[in-house]
């Protein structure tokens, strides 16, 4: 299955760019994941982190680490092709599931997901890592996830921030994140029009962000699933771990 879904050229592109598109990789899981998200939104977990814009537009729902209590999410993790694809892309002998993350931008929300890397937020250190960003609704190029090609190879440690722009860790003296939006012409920015069941696979260090959902009618439901490989170790970053450890 991993040979058929993640080819050698895709694995090489993942290593070089830190982000690739996998067409139809999770098409069989669209309906189960949609059902799981409806259950989750009706009964959020303890790690829900939703945002409501100050301008009164629709909310941006987020929730993490629910795969052990939402049956459809557990089935995806244990029976789906994610682990096999992750092993292939990471070049790892094994693949350990790290966590799930649901992101729902309701129609008309003005909230933008700012440019960031995931690695500074996680209680893990891993060169072998991959996130799958799986839309459950059609996603136009204007509202899709965007990734800075090759940014997973940047050597500088960058300062993580909350979505409101404040520092995540007090007294953090690392370099600020570059203003990708202001210098888009200096980077090769990857982004794709996507269908339900497609996926963007990206490295934890890949710089990424996403626009507001400007559609007045269409939701943008996304299920993200994250794996780590053989070299992953626990890293206490001084904050609340995700997943809790």
What do these predicted regions represent?
Residues 36, 47-48, 52, 157-163, ...:
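Non-heme Fe(II)/2-oxoglutarate
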Residues 82, 92, 107-110, 138-141, ...:
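Short, charged/polar surface micro-motifs in flexible loops or helix N-caps
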């Amino acid at each position: 299955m991993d040979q058929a879904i993640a080819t050698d050229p895709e694995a090489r592109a993942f290593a070089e760019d830190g982000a690739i598109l996998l067409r139809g990789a999770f098409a069989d899981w669209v309906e189960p994941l949609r059902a799981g998200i409806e259950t989750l939104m009706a009964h959020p977990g303890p790690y829900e982190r939703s945002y409501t814009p100050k301008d009164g537009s629709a909310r941006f729902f987020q929730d993490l680490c629910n795969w052990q209590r939402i049956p459809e999410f557990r089935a995806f993790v244990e029976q789906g092709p994610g682990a096999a694809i992750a092993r292939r892309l990471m070049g790892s002998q094994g693949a350990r599931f790290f966590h799930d993350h649901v992101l729902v931008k309701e129609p008309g929300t003005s909230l933008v997901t700012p440019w960031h890397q995931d690695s500074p937020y996680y209680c893990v250190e891993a060169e072998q890592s991959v996130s799958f960003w799986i839309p459950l609704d059609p996603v136009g190029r204007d509202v899709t996830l965007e990734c800075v090609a090759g940014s997973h190879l940047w050597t500088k440690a960058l300062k993580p921030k909350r979505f409101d722009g404040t520092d995540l860790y007090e007294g953090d003296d690392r370099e600020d994140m570059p203003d990708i939006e202001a210098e888009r012409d200096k980077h090769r920015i990857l982004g794709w029009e996507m269908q339900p069941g497609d996926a963007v696979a990206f490295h934890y260090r890949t710089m990424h962000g996403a626009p507001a959902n400007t559609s007045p009618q269409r939701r943008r439901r996304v299920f993200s699933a994250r794996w780590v490989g053989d070299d992953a170790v626990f890293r206490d970053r001084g904050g609340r771990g995700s997943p809790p450890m």
